[in-house]
């Protein structure tokens, strides 16, 4: 029973946001010179997230710094959005990015790997996922702390495989 309760609480936390104070929408909505310069060659993503998730904002900042443009949506039912996109609960994290082509990027996937994926999408791919919220992944930086993690290739048949193993912070950039 305790194990079930812990699982439910973990999933609830991941799907409803990180519990941090609301932050500004995104620098994508600002008039800063850097945002204007990056927009001309930017790859657009729609990012679904809780309005109170600070680590989601940090991931968006990471993506924008690497030439992506984020349009932010705050749906009231994140689990429904994820299910509609074909993301199984075991791959869940706190936010979901969707490319113009319809590929999904679940969680704290490094921009480098999103770009690599979009440049050469594997056959039958749904997208990439970093389940949960690994410490040290883009948007989850905590000083010098870093936990190695896998980036998963999600397939349209519901299966997954390892797309990349991230063993060091440097491999993310």
What are these regions (language model features)?
Residues 27-42:
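A short beta-strand-turn-helix
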Residues 1-6:
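Bacterial N-terminal signal peptides that target proteins for export
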Residues 38-60, 99:
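Local sequence-structure signature of Cys/Sec-based thiol-disulfide redox active-site neighborhoods
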Residues 18-22:
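Bacterial signal peptide processing site
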Residues 52, 59, 74-77, 110-114:
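Stable alpha-helical elements in mature extracytoplasmic
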Residues 60-80:
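Conserved helix-turn-beta segment immediately C-terminal to the redox Cys motif
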Residues 84, 90-173:
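Thiol/selenol-based redox catalytic cores and closely related redox-interacting motifs
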């Amino acid at each position: 029973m305790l194990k079930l309760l812990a699982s439910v609480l973990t999933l609830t936390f991941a799907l409803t946001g990180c519990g941090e104070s609301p932050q500004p929408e995104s620098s994508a909505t600002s008039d800063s010179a850097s945002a204007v310069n990056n927009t001309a060659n930017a790859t657009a993503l729609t990012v679904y997230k809780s309005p109170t998730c600070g680590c989601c904002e940090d991931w968006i900042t990471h993506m924008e710094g690497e030439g992506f443009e984020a349009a932010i949506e705050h749906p009231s039912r994140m689990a429904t959005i994820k299910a509609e996109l074909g993301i199984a609960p075991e791959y869940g994290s706190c936010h979901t990015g969707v490319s113009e082509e319809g590929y999904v990027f679940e969680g704290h996937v490094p921009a480098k790997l999103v770009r690599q994926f979009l440049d050469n999408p594997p056959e039958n791919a749904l997208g990439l996922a970093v389940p949960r919220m690994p410490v040290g992944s883009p948007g989850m930086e905590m000083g010098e702390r870093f936990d190695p993690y896998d980036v998963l290739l999600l397939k349209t048949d519901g299966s997954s495989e390892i797309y990349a193993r991230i063993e060091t912070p440097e491999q993310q950039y």
